[in-house]
From Swiss-Prot:
SUPFAM superfamilies: Variant surface glycoprotein (N-terminal domain), Variant surface glycoprotein MITAT 1.2, VSG 221, C-terminal domain. A lipid is attached at residue 495 (GPI-anchor amidated aspartate). This is Variant surface glycoprotein MVAT5. Pfam families: Trypan_glycop, Trypan_glycop_C. It comes from the Eukaryota. Keywords: Cell membrane, Disulfide bond, Glycoprotein, GPI-anchor, Lipoprotein, Membrane, Signal, Trypanosomiasis. The lineage of its organism: Eukaryota, Discoba, Euglenozoa, Kinetoplastea, Metakinetoplastina. Coiled coil: none annotated. One of its GO terms (cellular component) is plasma membrane. Residues 454-487 are annotated as: Disordered. InterPro entries: Trypano_VSG_A_N_dom, Variant_surf_glycoprt_trypan_C, VSG_C_dom_sf. Residues 471-487 have a biased composition (Basic and acidic residues). It comes from Trypanosoma brucei rhodesiense. Residues 1-21 form the signal peptide. The keyword Iron does not apply.
């Protein structure tokens, strides 16, 4: 029995056994080799649309901020209290500064977006050309250069197009699209493209069993039928390079261009490296600088460097101080003026847009509330209308004060001086002359002193212009400090004309501030 069994086993060993399919010269490129490149094309095709969306977002934010600034300016002109006016002024200044920051970088951001789109399309063009050529040489199910089978697999499943493949497998080989892409492109990492995984390029082991494909052969029966070609062929921008030696690898890795820029795996795919360098600048909205401050949200407004600076300069009145050094005071003042929660903030400020009435004369539209006006032109017209109205009111007050001031000025005449019959009462601008023959005119007007005093009164300058007392009034008691020459203020008797000039100066200053905003 043992002898018979031995004979049977020996015979079985002699029988032919089926062999697995093997990669061969003339095989089609396996799907697991070309699929990373196909995924990259889909990623790259999104970049122009993402760039366009990010630029549109920046432009829309600038327009939105411009409207908010105009609304804040109108509310400032119509503010019912000083605290409210200061708050609106700080908001308007902060929003204007934010607009300035965005606009100053707009050209740079536009150039970065264009560069990203151009570089991505250039790289995608290399890949798209590869897919078009490789698929075009198919002639039958078992004859062609691309297959949906993996490397080392059986011949067959050769393709001449990609429409029948799943969405995740289809290479993007069509025209450039700028259709907006709203989300960040996660396949663009900080170091490279996650799609472009490490590869050995095209070699015999990358192929399937023979499908009559000459394009990827590495020997003398390849593209050059008389001899091996002289150097590597950089298919698809070098990512799928074919070495002239049949099974020699041509390594490439597009997932990391940063850690080792001189790595040999990067040397042959510089077109993808350049594409990543440009695309990385629009990798996320934050990277591109398209994360914006929403000044209607208290938590964001409080963090705005522009609002904090405005609060420091305008509300605290400390323009020379540092925002960092005054951080505690700024936080306290923000809470006092704007509120400590979103509801209070909106109640004090942005909800007022629904209550502020804008008449037709201001906007050119039928009377409505400020929040209902969407036209920037109408908003700008209303701001000009109310600003002009405020400035006119200030000018009217200044004119009134000038008239009052001129009427109140005391002009001493020679006859006034003649009334003083003793030297101790003959004070400036009068002058005592002991040698005059006319005893009724020993005290007479000194023209020089009279001119000096009149000039001081007119300009609000001279002794007492800053609110100090003058010789005429300084020694008088409260009961003797009477108009038109003097006026009691605080604990001293002061020149009334100087007080009027001081008030006039304050009004001029107020008008100047109004013109600035």
């Amino acid at each position: 029995m043992i002898g018979k069994a031995f004979i049977i086993l020996s015979l079985l060993n002699e029988l032919p056994t089926p062999t697995a399919a093997q990669a061969a010269q003339g095989g089609a490129l396996g799907k697991d080799v070309w699929l990373p490149l196909a995924k990259f094309t889909a990623t790259a095709a999104k970049i122009p649309g993402r760039a366009a969306k990010l630029l549109q977002d920046r432009s829309a934010q600038i327009v939105n901020l411009m409207k908010l600034q105009v609304q804040a300016d109108i509310c400032l002109n119509k503010a019912a209290s000083e605290v409210s006016a200061l708050g609106w002024q700080a908001l308007a200044v902060a929003i204007a500064a934010d607009i300035g920051s965005l606009q100053s970088l707009q050209q740079q951001r536009s150039e970065e977006a264009i560069a990203a789109a151009a570089a991505a399309e250039f790289a995608r063009g290399h890949a798209a050309e590869f897919f078009k050529v490789a698929a075009a040489v198919q002639s039958a199910a078992n004859s062609g250069c691309l297959t949906t089978n993996n490397k080392g697999g059986a011949a067959g499943s050769v393709i001449n197009g990609f429409s029948t493949l799943g969405t995740a497998e289809q290479p993007a080989i069509g025209a450039t699209s700028t259709a907006h892409v709203g989300d960040d492109i996660t396949a663009i990492t900080t170091t490279g493209f996650s799609d472009l995984a490490a590869t050995d390029g095209i070699r015999t082991d990358s192929l399937t069993a023979d499908t009559n494909c000459v394009l990827f052969k590495g020997g003398s029966d390849g593209p050059l039928t008389t001899a091996n070609f002289g150097q590597s062929i950089p298919f698809a921008g070098g990512y799928l390079t074919r070495n002239p030696t049949a099974n020699t690898a041509s390594s490439a890795d597009g997932t990391d261009f940063v850690s080792n820029p001189e790595d040999s795996k990067i040397a042959g795919i510089k077109v993808y490296r350049d594409a990543h360098a440009a695309a990385a600048k629009i990798r996320t909205a934050a990277t591109f600088g398209s994360t914006f401050t929403d000044f209607k949200k208290l938590d964001q407004a409080k963090k705005s460097v522009h609002l904090r600076a405005a609060v420091k300069n305008i509300i605290l009145g400390k323009p020379d101080g540092s925002v960092d050094d005054l951080s505690g005071e700024i936080d306290t003042k923000i809470n006092q003026v704007f509120g400590e929660d979103q509801e209070t903030f909106h109640s004090r400020f942005w909800d007022q847009l629904t209550k502020v009435k804008v008449e037709k004369a201001a906007s050119g539209q039928e009377e409505t509330t400020l929040d209902a006006i969407t036209s920037f032109a109408a908003l700008s017209r209303a701001r000009t209308y109310y600003s002009t109205k405020v400035i006119k009111g200030l000018r009217d007050k200044i004119s009134s004060l000038e008239i009052k001031n001129s009427k109140t000025e005391v002009k001493v005449t020679d006859a006034d001086c003649n009334k003083h019959q003793s030297k101790d009462k003959c004070a400036a601008p009068c002058k005592w002359n002991e040698n005059t023959t006319d005893i009724n005119k020993k005290c007479s007007l000194d023209p020089v002193k009279a001119t000096e005093q009149q000039a001081a009164q007119t300009a609000g300058a001279g002794e007492g212009a800053a609110g100090t007392t003058t010789d005429k009034c300084k020694d008088k008691k409260k009961d003797d400090c009477k108009s038109p020459d003097c006026k009691w203020e605080g604990e001293t008797c002061k020149d009334s004309s100087i007080l009027l000039n001081k008030q006039f100066a304050l009004m001029v200053s107020a008008a100047f501030v109004a013109l600035l905003f």
